[in-house]
């Protein structure tokens, strides 16, 4: 079986792009800014990532009660439909490459295995990024500085 993944460099470049954006922003503003990285606005607080040609291209946007963007996530790999040793090796390798690249750029990650392996970085400027190795994919969640501050105040 063959699966696709965006490069770890591309995933981290996307995070760096969003970390360097002016915050706060509404979901509509985020959708428009996303066009600079090849993402297209979609219905109702969503974006689409056609550039990396992964099996799941949706980029859902979460919003705070104030109407500001809280976070959004994107797939760094295809979604694996048939589980097995080959799929596990693919996902493990892609996750390891992503964590290695993130560590080179942002320093040591806070690691967790609570719901599967994940690595979290609190970035300069206040934003937060989490790379996760799920059962069927590797994902990246970007949290805006405003919502990351809320999470820190809650002890998360």
Label each residue range with its predicted role.
Residues 124-126:
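Glycine-centered tight beta-turn/hairpin loop motif at sheet-sheet or coil-to-beta transitions
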């Amino acid at each position: 079986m063959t699966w696709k993944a965006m490069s770890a460099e591309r995933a981290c470049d996307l995070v760096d792009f969003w970390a360097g954006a002016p915050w706060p922003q509404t979901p509509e503003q985020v959708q428009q800014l996303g066009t600079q990285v090849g993402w297209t606005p979609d219905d109702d607080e969503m974006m689409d990532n056609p550039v990396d040609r992964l099996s799941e291209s949706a980029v859902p946007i979460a919003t705070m009660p104030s109407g500001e963007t809280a976070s959004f996530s994107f797939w760094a790999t295809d979604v694996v439909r048939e589980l097995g040793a080959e799929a596990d090796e693919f996902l493990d390798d892609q996750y390891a490459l992503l964590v290695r690249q993130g560590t080179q750029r942002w320093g040591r990650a806070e690691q967790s295995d609570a719901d599967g392996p994940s690595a979290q970085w609190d970035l300069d400027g206040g934003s937060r990024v989490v790379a996760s190795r799920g059962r069927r994919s590797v994902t990246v969640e970007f949290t805006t500085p405003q919502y990351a501050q809320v999470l820190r105040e809650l002890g998360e």
